[in-house]
């Protein structure tokens, strides 16, 4: 029997997903601010949890977008238009503008092979090949230009996985989703075990890549396919159960009994929150700033640390960084992201 994703029109129009994405982006900002500035910052949501939340929401919304698209080409173009323009902007802008704070003279900077390697590697979403620019942020605690970009290649891989996964979801979605989920959990557990046994950070890096993160994405898809079953028929016991699992994992990170069910529990909490707090949709009226906030926050923090502004005044440094990132995110949305999305939507309506 075929099962199709269900998502009521009322919830589609009024939900808190944009608010949650902004919240998770801010959580990643908080974690990176503390790490880069070597400041102890307390925030209830870690960067890993924020990224996991992003992937869960993506699994839910992007899969829904695929089923609502006119075809594979339409789906791919939508994903490219949403992700690529702002990504290219932040990579190119950092490469050009950060020459102003490089320890190298302009001529040496722009003729250095690392400058071009950075552009090629990062524009190819292979950030790990060249995460630094010549002479930039060399006196910071970490010399990386944008340590947040590693998730974008994972996100794109997950987007590409959706059409392939959809081929197998036509008849036995529960079995297929369950199989992919379990395999991802096994991969995550194996990489964690190997890292703890050997101390080799390669296993930790592999754990954070596509195969380890797909469990969160699939958890979001599960909530989409069984939306009514989970959020309406059985929410009375599923929601408290998910909350208990989430809290246990929060206070006992990495326990082998909790880790396999944590993504599903987190997904239940996220989707339930987004659907039952529809008033938070007011955030969407002003724009979807979460992507820009996520893209720009890391280099902004690094830049202010590099020029040594307010380093001895953490609260002022935080406010300056937050306001700058927020401003860039707003400008990026209104001047670039929204215009591209709106222009292409208009072109699609004009096509016969």
Please provide the spans of the model-predicted regions.
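Interfacial loop-to-helix transition and helix-capping segments at the boundaries
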Residues: 12-17, 39-51, 141-154, 190-216, ...
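Membrane-interface helix-loop-helix regions
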Residues: 88-154, 262-269, 273
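Alpha-helical transmembrane segments of multi-pass integral membrane proteins
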Residues: 244-338
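Aromatic-anchored segments of alpha-helical transmembrane domains
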Residues: 26-33, 181-194, 241-253, 296-303
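Solvent-exposed interhelical
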Residues: 156-185, 224-237, 310-314
